[in-house]
């Protein structure tokens, strides 16, 4: 796949620092060395293996793979790709993996009408999870972060309360907001 654009995930930063993931459901494959970072990208198929029937040269795809996308070209198994919907800009398509993860998390957390939800971190995924929580009927969505810009964005996107954990104790604040019940 010829890369169009790639994102830098928090896990990429951890891997770069030498922290490898545990063998869990998310990370089924042990890393192979040399270990190339990157798993958030989108691009165009430039070659296919003889047993591949799902994709052809020229198809635009989003990568949902384990690693190796920090390159102009990368190799992927067919199951680690998803076709880009017709008309979707490739700059947006490259965000397919983190968007899908955040949407899945946000929509499958068991949030119910009237719940209070605390989202720890106002990054890309946290913003999406906060919005999904509101859509699922959460009464109160609280976003905690240390960066004012992320907190301001969360507030503008519908968070009810934002907490800067550099300035306030989030546990004490959540308890105060919920009459000691918590979230």
Q: Which residues does each predicted region cover?
A:
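Glycine-rich beta-strand-centered segment in the early N-terminal region that forms part
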Residues: 1-7, 21-67, 85
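Cytochrome P450 core scaffold surrounding the K-helix E-X-X-R motif
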Residues: 11-17
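A structural motif shared across PLP-dependent enzymes of the aminotransferase-like
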Residues: 65-78
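Mid-domain Rossmann-like dinucleotide-binding core that forms the NAD(H)/NADP(H) cofactor-binding site
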Residues: 89-168, 172
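A glycine-rich helix->loop->beta "capping" turn
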Residues: 177-183
């Amino acid at each position: 796949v010829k890369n169009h654009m790639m994102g830098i995930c928090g896990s990429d930063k951890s891997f770069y620092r030498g922290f490898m993931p545990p063998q869990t459901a998310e990370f089924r494959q042990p890393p192979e060395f040399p270990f190339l970072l990157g798993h958030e990208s989108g691009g165009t198929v430039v070659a296919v293996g003889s047993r591949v029937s799902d994709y052809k040269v020229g198809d635009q795809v989003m990568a949902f793979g384990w690693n190796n996308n920090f390159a102009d070209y990368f190799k992927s198994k067919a199951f680690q790709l998803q076709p880009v919907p017709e008309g979707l800009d490739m700059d947006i398509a490259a965000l397919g993996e983190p968007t899908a993860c955040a949407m899945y998390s946000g929509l499958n957390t068991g949030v119910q009408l009237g719940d209070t939800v605390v989202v720890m971190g106002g990054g890309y995924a946290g913003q999406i999870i906060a919005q999904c929580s509101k859509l699922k009927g959460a009464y109160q969505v609280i976003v905690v972060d240390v960066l004012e810009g992320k907190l301001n964005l969360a507030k503008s996107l519908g968070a009810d309360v934002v907490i800067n954990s550099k300035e306030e104790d989030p546990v004490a604040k959540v308890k105060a907001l919920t009459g000691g019940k918590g979230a």
